[in-house]
């Protein structure tokens, strides 16, 4: 599919990702960690493994993977309040999405009765914080599980595949990949795709923020998303090499 020439930040094409950098092992005490950078968006992802599972999971002889998400106060242009007991609905929605996404590629029986918590802290936000979180969280999770294998606590890494996420949208009538904040803040259509390395979708979130969209536009957005996911999956592999 051909895309119209549009004027985007950094001279990006409509179907081009922002510069993406995935840096592993950035935290000394985490079992696995990754700094995920999508342009000016930066998310610190840290995975910790603990013995035992939530009470409702006991007796299942299977593990659990969960996530927490938060934005640091100075991560945006205007200071956002630090979250304490009163969690923001948006943050809770995103951390549930991260947890769901990761669980789809974990063999819980092979994990055994361990709980993995992946903390995703946004240190700088410029759009796409949830997609950067998921992409970096998978690497942090993978490295934490690999550490447990090396320690003799697991026989093998209980992963069935990779997971990455990317945003798509319609801005000023143009179908775009990987929106930054300036684009996302006035997008007519906003969409997020979470998918595996085999191309299977885990979650698709799409909203006509300012205008409805038809099946043709949806297909174009999905084509962009597939392209972005494939590139992110390859970047994850390169980070592991």
Regions picked out by a protein language model, each given a short descriptive name:
Residues 78-82, 114-124:
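Glycine/charged-rich beta-loop-alpha catalytic/anionic-binding loops adjacent to active sites
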Residues 21-23, 35-37, 44-46, 66, ...:
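Structured core elements
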Residues 16, 28-30, 39-41, 61, ...:
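Short flexible coil/turn linkers enriched for glycine and charged/polar residues
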Residues 109-110, 128-132, 142-146, 153-241:
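A structural signal for small-residue-enriched, beta-sheet-centric alpha/beta enzyme cores
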Residues 96, 119-147:
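Conserved mixed alpha/beta catalytic, RNA-binding, or beta-rich assembly cores of soluble enzyme
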Residues 1-37:
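Short, Gly/Pro- and small/polar-rich lid/capping loops
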Residues 20-23, 29-32, 50-53, 103-105, ...:
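Glycine-rich, charged/polar anion/phosphate-binding loops
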Residues 26, 34-111, 201, 205-219, ...:
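Glycine-rich, flexible beta-strand/loop modules in the N-terminal catalytic cores of phosphate-handling
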């Amino acid at each position: 599919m051909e895309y119209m020439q549009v004027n985007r930040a950094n001279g990006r094409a409509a179907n081009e990702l922002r510069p993406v950098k995935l840096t592993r092992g950035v935290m000394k005490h985490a079992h696995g960690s990754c700094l995920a950078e999508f342009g000016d968006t930066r998310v610190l992802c840290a995975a910790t493994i603990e013995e035992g599972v939530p009470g409702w999971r006991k007796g299942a002889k299977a593990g659990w993977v969960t996530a927490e998400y938060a934005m640091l106060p100075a991560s945006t242009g205007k200071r956002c309040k630090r979250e304490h007991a009163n969690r923001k609905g948006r943050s809770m929605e995103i951390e549930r999405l991260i947890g769901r996404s990761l669980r789809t590629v974990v063999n819980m029986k092979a994990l055994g009765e361990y709980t993995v918590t992946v903390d995703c802290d946004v240190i700088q936000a410029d759009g796409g914080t949830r997609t950067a979180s998921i992409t970096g969280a998978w690497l942090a999770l993978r490295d934490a599980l690999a550490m447990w294998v090396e320690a003799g606590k697991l026989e093998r890494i209980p992963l069935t595949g990779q997971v990455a996420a990317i945003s798509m949208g319609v801005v000023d009538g143009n179908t775009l990949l990987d929106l930054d904040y300036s684009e996302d803040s006035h997008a007519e259509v906003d969409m997020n795709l979470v998918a595996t390395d085999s191309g299977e979708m885990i979650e698709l979130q799409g909203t006509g923020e300012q205008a409805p969209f038809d099946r043709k536009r949806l297909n174009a957005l999905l084509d962009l998303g597939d392209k972005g996911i494939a590139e992110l999956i390859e970047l994850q592999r390169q980070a592991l090499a």
